[in-house]
A protein has these predicted regions:
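Histidine-centered, transition-metal-coordinating active-site segments
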Residues: 1-92, 101-406
Length: 406
């Protein structure tokens, strides 16, 4: 057994079984995949990676299961939680939920979207599912033989793949999927406090101990006890504040947009390996940064030296956001014609869906929105950021004309 000291969860114990997966080259690669793209250009402490986040999710999966088992006793039959090997398998699914992330995480996925929609390149892009679809293939390529050896009593590889893809077929898979990927899950319960810690802000500081001690699994659904309502409200508000102030910070958006267009250039010029599981070992942040100069001096200076690009001070919000969405074709043309030196980056997030969070109250399962006035007031976040390189400052007529309609 190994023990790792984590700044969020304290000591994390790792069994020799799980260590065999963590020690592989493909998992160690996550040490070199930024958790939050180029957010460190605005919040210098945000240099943490998908590696420690994945360890945190693995730890929380076991913690969640421990308390679900206690709290659900006598209410729901969860015989599969009596099997320690099953619990280990679910924790491995948590460990591997981000194994498919590309360099700079979601920023690379945005680059694939831009490559396809703006520059017309033939790339694999599956929207928000990109990293989990690729991750399923990465597991097949690099880890399936190890997983099969470690978990001989289960169809373990398919179990993990269906869990991380959120396509569960069995009751056990549905249970695992709800713990790893739902409105209140081990994933968000790790990244909110972790990202908050490294950003140096307090928005993501949730009462994690209280939350995990309040979880139950009833009628094949992850629910929280009534007494946890304030904790869930805090959780959702913390998430909203983190999106508003950190993830959707306008300057963070600008630099991630710059990097996205730079990566698109690298893809267009065949300067980085094809996005394929066989090439995943090579694909990390260091590779992209080493190639950035070849995408263009403007992008290199913008990303490495934080020079050259400016942001239009007026963010695109409300009716202006809708106008820009309705005129997306023209905006894409502006970006394409300027070769990425004029940028538009949009943010969109829904805090939660009403059918996602439930509370166990008076022997009934009730939607959180029925018992919380705070939650019903949460709204979607929609905004856009416009940026440009100083060399094209006199070529902003088309963007300025669009802004006049706002």
């Amino acid at each position: 057994m190994k023990i790792i000291r984590d700044p969020i969860h304290g000591y994390i114990e790792i069994s020799d079984k799980i260590l065999q997966i963590i020690s592989t080259d493909i998992f160690q690669r996550l040490r070199h995949i930024s958790q939050t793209g180029l957010a460190y250009l605005v919040y210098p402490g945000m240099r943490h990676t998908r590696f420690e986040h994945s360890l945190g999710v693995m730890y929380l999966v076991k913690e969640f299961i421990r308390y679900i088992k206690i709290n659900s006793e006598g209410i729901e039959s969860l015989d599969f939680l009596e099997d320690d090997e099953f619990i280990d398998l679910v924790s491995v699914a948590g460990l591997l939920h981000d194994i498919g992330h590309l360099p700079f995480s979601h920023t690379f996925e945005n680059a694939l979207s831009i490559s396809k929609e703006v520059y017309g390149l033939d790339v694999e892009y599956y929207g928000k599912k990109t990293h989990v679809i690729l991750g399923s293939r990465v597991i097949d390529t690099y880890l399936s033989h190890i997983i099969d050896k470690l978990f001989k009593n289960f169809n373990s590889v398919n179990f993990i793949q269906r869990v991380i893809l959120s396509t569960p077929k069995t009751r056990e898979e549905k249970f695992a999927s709800s713990i790893i990927s739902s409105a209140i899950d081990a994933d968000r319960s790790d990244y909110l406090p972790r990202d908050s810690y490294f950003a140096g802000v307090g928005y993501g500081n949730i009462d994690l101990e209280r939350l995990k001690r309040s979880l139950m699994y009833v009628n094949d659904r992850l629910v929280a006890m009534k007494k946890a309502i304030p904790v869930i409200e805090q959780f959702l508000l913390s998430r909203m504040y983190m999106y508003q102030t950190i993830y959707f910070h306008s300057v963070v958006g600008l630099y991630n947009a710059i990097l996205s267009h730079a990566i698109s250039r690298l893809i267009e010029k065949d300067l980085i390996p094809k996005i394929d599981p066989e090439n995943y070992i090579e694909l990390n942040d260091f590779l992209i940064l080493s190639k950035i100069r070849e995408s263009g001096k403007e992008f290199y200076d913008g990303i490495v030296n934080r020079r050259g690009f400016k942001r239009v001070k007026k963010d695109v919000v409300d009716s202006c956001y809708k106008f820009f969405e309705d005129n997306r074709k023209e905006i894409n043309e502006v970006m394409r014609d300027s070769k990425g030196l004029i940028l538009y980056h949009d943010f969109y997030d829904v805090p939660y869906s009403e059918d996602e969070i439930f509370v166990y109250q008076d022997d009934e399962i009730k939607p959180l929105s029925n018992v919380s006035n705070i939650i019903s007031s949460l709204r979607s976040i929609k905004k856009g950021v416009i940026g440009y390189h100083e060399s094209v400052e006199n070529k902003l007529e088309r963007i300025n004309n669009l802004l006049k309609n706002c």
